């Protein structure tokens, strides 16, 4: 039991001696209870620690109850869907038609680059438009059909041979420019995804990340992606064993393994290192004649 250190401890006076002398009066001494004070100090320290812990816990709960600020959400970015706002601003100024264009297939080892241009109907802008990379295959297919049914659409393919000859950037810009000029009505303004403007017969505005900002570009990205995916499935029938229907020509391990086992096809791009190495092994060997599916323009006019 811990004593109360606030009250001093009194030592009783010594009794009178038996010799008959007068008993001396001894003043009671006050003894400082060192051991008791130490024990009490530990208790006080423990109490203070418990109190601090309780305060910290309360603060943590209060912080958790507050809504997280944008500054605290590191790495979390709220992505707003593409809008038709910039197109409407141009329409108010009397500028029409307005096209968006984008491409698909710059990075794969095989297959073409596919460019698409789209002029959306302001009264029938499909809901759910977004960058094709952020959509599921099922959602892309559904939007593809809706876009083709309500908008002006053109699709152009740049073959692997053109990519090998001109490089991937020039082939992509060539396809994008042709897609714009292949539209039923030549647009007065074009939004293109990326840094590079096109040499078109109308005003062209390059927008970095445009497929996630502008509805017309988002629609074009969906048309280009679905068109290319469908074509790669056709190539898979002509070139079995490569898995084009699965990876769409990208350099995944399964594709690299097939390339090492079977060698490259005419649909592979020579300037990629794995393809170049495979070509060196079979240089001079006869190549199978495969029907060319590229360099064709496909135009789908808007329905009434």
Curated annotation (Swiss-Prot):
Task: Report biased composition (Low complexity) as residue ranges.
Answer: 36-53
Q: Where in the cell is it found?
A: Cytoplasm
Which residues are a divalent metal cation-binding?
102-103, 193
Per the UniProt entry, what are the Gene Ontology biological process annotations, in alphabetical order?
DNA replication, removal of RNA primer; mismatch repair
- Residue ranges, annotated region (Disordered): 1-53
Assigned EC number: 3.1.26.4
User: Predominant location of this chain?
Assistant: cytoplasm
- Source organism, top-level taxon: Bacteria
Listed CDD domains: RNase_HII_bacteria_HII_like
Molecular function terms from GO: manganese ion binding; RNA binding; RNA-DNA hybrid ribonuclease activity
HAMAP family xref list: RNase_HII_B
Described function: Endonuclease that specifically degrades the RNA of RNA-DNA hybrids.
Q: Family, per the entry?
A: Belongs to the RNase HII family.
Name of this protein: Ribonuclease HII
Query: What is the protein's species of origin?
Result: Rhodopseudomonas palustris (strain ATCC BAA-98 / CGA009)
Name of the encoding gene: rnhB
């Amino acid at each position: 039991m811990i004593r109360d250190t606030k009250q001093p401890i009194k030592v009783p006076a010594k009794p009178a001696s038996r010799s008959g002398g007068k008993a001396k009066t001894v003043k009671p001494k006050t003894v400082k209870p060192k051991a008791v004070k130490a024990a009490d100090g530990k208790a006080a320290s423990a109490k203070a620690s418990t109190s601090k812990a309780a305060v910290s816990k309360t603060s943590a709960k209060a912080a958790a109850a507050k809504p997280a600020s944008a500054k605290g959400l590191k790495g979390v970015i709220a992505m707003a869907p593409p809008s038709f706002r910039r197109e409407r601003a141009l329409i108010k100024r009397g500028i029409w038609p307005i096209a968006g264009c984008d491409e698909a297939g710059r990075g794969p080892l095989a297959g073409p680059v596919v460019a698409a241009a789209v002029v959306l109907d302001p009264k029938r802008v499909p809901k759910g438009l977004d960058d094709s990379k952020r959509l599921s295959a099922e959602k892309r297919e559904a939007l593809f059909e809706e876009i083709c049914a309500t908008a002006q659409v053109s699709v152009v393919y740049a073959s692997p041979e053109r990519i090998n000859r001109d490089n991937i950037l020039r082939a992509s810009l060539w396809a994008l420019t042709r897609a714009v000029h292949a539209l039923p009505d030549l647009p007065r303004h074009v939004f293109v995804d990326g840094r590079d403007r096109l040499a078109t017969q109308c005003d062209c505005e390059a927008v970095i990340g445009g497929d996630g900002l502008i509805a017309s570009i988002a629609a074009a990205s969906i048309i280009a992606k679905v068109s290319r995916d469908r074509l790669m499935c056709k190539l898979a029938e002509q070139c079995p064993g490569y898995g084009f229907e699965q990876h769409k020509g990208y350099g995944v391990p399964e594709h690299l393994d097939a390339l090492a086992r079977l060698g490259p096809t005419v649909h592979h791009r020579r300037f990629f290192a794995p393809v170049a190495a495979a070509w060196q092994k079979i240089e001079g060997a006869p190549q199978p004649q495969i029907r060319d599916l590229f360099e064709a323009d496909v135009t789908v006019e808007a329905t009434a």
